Amino acid sequence: MQDYEYIKIRELEKWKLKMKKKPSIINKASKETQNKLNSILPEQYHSIITSAIKNMTKVVLFGSKYTTKTPIINIFIEERDNLAYEKIRLYKKTAMLEGAGTGAGGILIGLADFPLLLSIKIKLLYEIASIYGFDTNDYKERIYILNIFQLAFSSQNHVNDIFKNMENFDFLKETLSNDINDFDWRKFQQEYRDYIDLAKLLQLVPGIGAFVGAYVNNKLVDKLGDYAIYSYHMRLLNSNNCIVEKESWISRQYKYIFNKKIDKKSN
């Protein structure tokens, strides 16, 4: 278990650097292209997407249908990871079948894929949160879920902003507002739409819609699952949270060495 923790801490540090990476020229160009694409998409598409995201956000913040899982406590991080990866595999299969089915149905049925996929993703995040011992009945844990969502499906510039808050979430959560109006869901929905619009648009094309739908949904859920695992590792491996097994000696040694390197660089 000690060796496993050591490996996961190293992987986590690499992932953190990726989240802090500044937008590349390609990232910036892609954002400009997406803005142009938004201007030519049909109004019906924009209306359905905006409505779906708005309703989904309300469900995440206030709904109860996703909060049925009891947080799992007193198991090792490796056991949590195994449970999480099993859930991701299950939800990937579900998303692929859903994407292939709606993609084969033409434009009108294809449009229905967006809210269905949102629901699949949110259910997966609730499952993973409980696996890592967090109670999604807590409104602020739902905010963390939305942050994971944004981290996986946003431009790099927005990822940088979101990650700053997530990295110290357990210290900042006590200062978070309980008012839904303080959450920037406009930015949330626009970033998500911009991230997947092109792929979802291709899903509406006759002949290739089913293949694109299955492939894209599989990739999106896979990425979300990985980001969720890293996001909860960041809280469990970086804290003395009581739901985590006692921190191993090798983990403490790695953190000590890593922090010493950081101190030297800063000096």
Put a short name on every predicted segment.
Residues 118-124:
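Structural signature of FAD isoalloxazine-binding scaffolds in flavoprotein oxidoreductases
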Residues 1-98, 126-267:
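Terminal, membrane-proximal amphipathic helices
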